[in-house]
Amino acid sequence: IMANLDRIVNVQISLNTTGISKEGFSTLLIVGEHLNTLSRVTTYTNVDSMLEDGFKATDKLYLAAADAFSQIPRPNIVKIGRRQVDEINISVSDVKDNTKYKITLETKKGKQDYEYSSSSEASATTIIEGLQTLMNAHEEITVTAESEKLKLETKEKGTAFTVSLSSNLSCEPILATETLSETMAAIVASDNDFYGIALVSREKSDILALAQWTETHTKLFGCVVNEKEATDSEIDTDIGSLLKSNNYYRTFWLYHTNDDDFPECALFARCFAINPGGETWANKKLAGVIADNLTETEYLAITNKNGNTFENFRNVAITQNGKTSAGEWIDVIRFRDWLQEEIMVNVFNVLINRDKIPFTD
């Protein structure tokens, strides 16, 4: 454990700070639920590695990372932050006689395969009950069979586990069992070397919670708002309006209607390829993202709420506005954070590398 530099050199440029490496100011973290790795933060250099870890090409986290890696130039790394899931439900998707059904369960204490062979008179109930009998003695996971479903629940909240299923079994959509503040506290305790944050959830409560958390940290949160109300200037209860009314300097949002596109991840990747202060977040082309068709009235409503758009202009699609929810330019916030960290590190290096710093002109 190393002491914090600001004990010796404390630099304040309007915003508070925590330590990030130079590389970290160009690193994106995508946050979402998954059961594919035990680590809170996993670093990937391409999407193929995500498939090897058990992600599916239809998973939101995969799609978000794919939009980031699709940009030119592409990022060297993208980090995936895991939200804790404490319970899941597994069901039989294909009932067959004399067939093997396999679940691989891993915790930090070890990995175990559970394989059940169905009888000549197989049913979903007998298969689930057979798997439950095999898994019942697990030290960290409670396994119960109910209504043709196998429920796996951690005995202690927060226990990390991964699950891999044979193709004849399926898992219901998983839900996080912790708040976003708890998620981010666990993530930064594991790996704080990132700057951009994206969230696969587009729920209003999740976006507002992460925006609030980000405002107290040296990070930048980008999100998508898909509410039609965001395009209406007379409505002030949509996510975009609420982000503006809270005056969030560290959050920017794009209006986008395609649920499988993550333009915020694409924009992060595109702009993070440029050194802090040398970029603008407007007028950027985004590979792999479908442009929205907006009327001028809708565009003006969005930008009046300090939102951003990705639209077609003749034969090219580009981003528009380039501002945070508080109305500040996104590049100004990133450069300010980078400059603050740069000054602190450089002054600290002078202090430790010189015998004495005289207090003279």
Language model segments and positions:
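Structured, hydrophobic secondary-structure cores that serve as assembly/anchoring elements
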Residues: I1-Y62, A66-N76, T309-F310, R314-D361
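Short, hydrophobic/proline-enriched secondary-structure or compact coil segments at domain edges
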Residues: L29-V31, T104, L150-E153, D193-R202, ...
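Extended, beta-strand-rich, solvent-exposed assembly scaffolds of outer structural proteins
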Residues: N46-E52, D94-L165
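Extended, compositionally biased
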Residues: A66-D86, K151-V163
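Surface-exposed cap/loop segments at beta↔alpha junctions
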Residues: R83-E87, E106-K108, S170-T179
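Disulfide-bonded cysteine-rich modules in secreted/extracellular proteins
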Residues: Q84-K96, L180-A186
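A glycine- and small-residue-enriched flexible loop/hinge signal that marks low-structured segments
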Residues: T133, V188-N353, D361
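Long, acidic/polar, low-complexity amphipathic helices and coiled-coil-like
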Residues: T144, K155-K219
